[in-house]
Amino acid sequence: MGITLREINGDNFDEIIALKVEKYCASNLYSLAQAKVYTEAIPLAIYNDDIAVGFIMYEIEPRDNNEYWIDRLMIDEKHQKKGYGKIAMEIIIDKIKQDKTHNKIKLSTNPDNFIGRKFYRNLGFKETGEMHGDEVLMVLEY
């Protein structure tokens, strides 16, 4: 299984915005629009070999003491339950950890997304007991 994260450009834009997930995640088109407005956001396509299977976006959040945030993770509904999301998250977490000036990564998820919350806990994230808007705030400290 060759999971890689790739830049989104004119060559793969259409295939990335065509990826779908049933619930709990903004569309990839909306996320790409956010990345255009919030230029600190880094959107990436998730590929298994040469097949686009998902989308991930992270950033250093200037409105939150320059903390790292993983803003989005989605795996297309046809490609779920194959370990792609876990590998993509591990790649991003390892990349963020290379920045020795930080020691935590934040994300938030829908409180009803019990599968997602368990997924993030299995990666080492802990629920803080706080809400980020209407979502559960989770933090990975390292």
PLM feature spans:
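Acetyl-CoA-dependent GNAT
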Residues: 2-71, 76-78, 95, 99, ...
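Active-site acidic-Proline motif in GNAT/NAT acetyltransferases
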Residues: 76-78, 82, 111-112
